[in-house]
Amino acid sequence: MNHYLWSLYLQAGGQTIVERFTAFETGDREKFAAFIRSLMQAYCPDAALIDDVAIDIDDAISALNESEEISKNEELSADKDSNLRNNPDYYEQVANNLWQTLRESLYNEVQDIGKVTDKEIFHVFCDNIVYFSVLDYAESPDMIPYFFPRLYNVLSSIAETFEIKLPELPSRRAYKDRFALYYNLNAILKAYREEQEWSSAELCAFLYDFAPKFVGGTNWIWSKLPEPSAAFVIGAPPDADEWLRKGCKENSFAWQGNPETQPGDVILLYQWTPTSAFTSIWQATAPGFIDPLFWYYRCIYFGRPVYVQPLTFRELRDDPILGKIPLVKAKMQGMNGTALKPSEYNRVLECLDSKGNDTSFLPKLTEHYTAADAEIRIERDVEKQLLEPLLERLGWTRAQYVRQMPLRMGRGSTVYPDYVILPQFTPNYEKGYWIVEAKKSISNDKQLHVDFGQAISLSLIHI
């Protein structure tokens, strides 16, 4: 962190933000929800999500005000804060205490310990993470309130920019590990705060005001969308009517979807009520991402809805093409994030058109090139069955490219790009027009950047 920039921030109004968090820590919680709402508007494009956060904050403050222990907790907070440095198990203890409290609360509801699973406990935590984090923050300023729900991409961008190493992402069904991640995150942020010699209020000002603006605010939402490269199906949430009421060009909404979603991709919204049907077509406004503290784990942002005459499940099922789609055969179960082939999506448009919908202005998809008889088992299959035929289709003959061209990087060190187009073999001065790296699969956007970086590194050696 550049201390000069931080000093300028404090002088330019940041000190007021710090003082507002300090006031909360000392018991002045009046209008705190409105204060956080104003901060979130700089980095969260989903107005409904900001509303939910404000409600959770108000609920937490109401619970604090009603607690007979609140004054006692405030008196002890300074002692707890001083003891944290000498207690490496503090965050684990806090996590275990809340986990046990949630377990007991769920048991009291169902009276069946067999139904109180890690999954159920974590679900309650996810749905109330802002609420619980505000309670934790009120008890000890070393517990940072969490105002990044469905915004882990923003937190990740901040961490990458300021060299804060976030915890490794647990798998989707590792519910207790995902729960622990929040407390591990608190420990990491505390260490960063101590490194910067900040107060807890300064850390909060950094996280929720300085840093989001520094990394671009809501600029991660694309204002000008590219042509779509894919189409995905999502199921409408319970508050779909609210979405439809607020939906407009300027709004983006967060929901579960496919993390491989890219800006411009088509999002087909399927509603279960009042009728089971596709009712609108949207577009992704940001890259999809994994959010381990979002119950559904996989998050997308989308907007720009176009409302259509519903295409019902019965019509999907009875269509000779759409009826063969595995998703339709499964009666639309597990739909969120399911990709449609370009031919399938375009068939949806044809069906909508036949019902009187004007589809001329809706985004279209074109088929991606694949070898019809390709059977891909290993990376070499990608090269032989997909890449080499593609190079020939682009006009390059086999005499114009070479596979595994050796590039010497010094004494005894050699690397081998998968393909080099128009190679020149002058020793120690090898050159080429461009290189191609083949991959059997790229699991996510992060891996795409890693693999692309590998190709760039190879191209900068000699090529």
Question: For the regions a protein language model found, what residue spans apply to each?
Answer:
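Charged, often low-complexity linker/regulatory segments
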Residues: 1-45, 342-403
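An N-terminal alpha-helical hairpin/helix-loop-helix interaction module that forms a charged
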Residues: 1-125, 140-226
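A short, conserved, highly charged catalytic patch centered on acidic carboxylates
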Residues: 263, 272, 361-461
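Aromatic- and Lys/Arg-enriched surface recognition patch
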Residues: 279, 283-342
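Active-site-adjacent loop/helix micro-motif of nuclease/hydrolase catalytic cores
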Residues: 243-246, 292-293, 309-315, 430, ...
